[in-house]
């Protein structure tokens, strides 16, 4: 990522954030670098723009901060080092270093290229990037991509968590759902965790 195309770097960070937080696109583009804090290589804490109004307005949906934990933060084996390429904390450090020059906004995710590089990224543009990322994961596995939209990352992330045995209440709170029906009706899908992870790692 240190020398990769900036479009790839931005899209990769956005995809990792979407998959590890289960946030909506609008919530991801509301994250800022103000108050952003790293706790070594183990986690990063971010805050949304105070003016941001989430889709689900409730005490739960206004939670802050957003805490993102590292993936294999201290890799020892070749396999651990390979999986560490998917670490969102690592990706965040590289992204912030590469956007430190030319940054025009306090928003975390920025545009690149075009007429105004370094400006705040819109949720619409982010949606396109997320769909491209999911499509790439499917095609890398040699499978046809289903009908996709940016919201698919939200369903994928929460489905992986449920299938991996994460406590349902923790999943529900992360996604800001009031009950089980929302997840089962709109988001649940069977996910082969190892296949998806391996497909993305090959592109890292």
Annotate each PLM feature.
Residues 1-204:
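Extended, non-catalytic subsegments within catalytic or DNA/protein-binding/adaptor domains
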């Amino acid at each position: 990522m240190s020398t990769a195309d900036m479009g790839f770097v931005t899209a990769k960070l956005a995809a990792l954030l979407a998959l590890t937080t289960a946030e909506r696109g609008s919530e991801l583009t509301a994250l800022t670098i103000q108050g952003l804090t790293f706790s070594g290589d183990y986690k990063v804490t971010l805050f949304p723009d105070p003016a941001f109004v989430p889709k689900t307005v409730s005490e739960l949906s206004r939670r802050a901060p957003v805490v993102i934990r590292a993936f294999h933060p201290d890799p020892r084996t070749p396999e651990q080092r390979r999986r560490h390429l998917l670490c969102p904390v690592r990706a965040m450090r590289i992204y912030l270093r590469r956007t430190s020059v030319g940054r025009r906004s306090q928003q975390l995710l920025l545009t690149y290229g075009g007429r105004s590089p370094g400006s705040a990224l819109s949720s619409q543009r982010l949606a396109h990037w997320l769909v491209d990322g999911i499509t790439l994961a499917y095609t890398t596995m040699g499978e046809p991509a289903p009908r996709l939209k940016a919201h698919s990352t939200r369903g994928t992330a929460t489905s992986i968590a449920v299938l991996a045995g994460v406590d349902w209440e923790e999943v529900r709170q992360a996604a800001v759902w009031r009950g089980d029906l929302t997840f089962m009706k709109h988001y649940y899908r069977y996910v082969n965790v190892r296949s998806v992870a391996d497909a993305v790692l090959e592109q890292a």
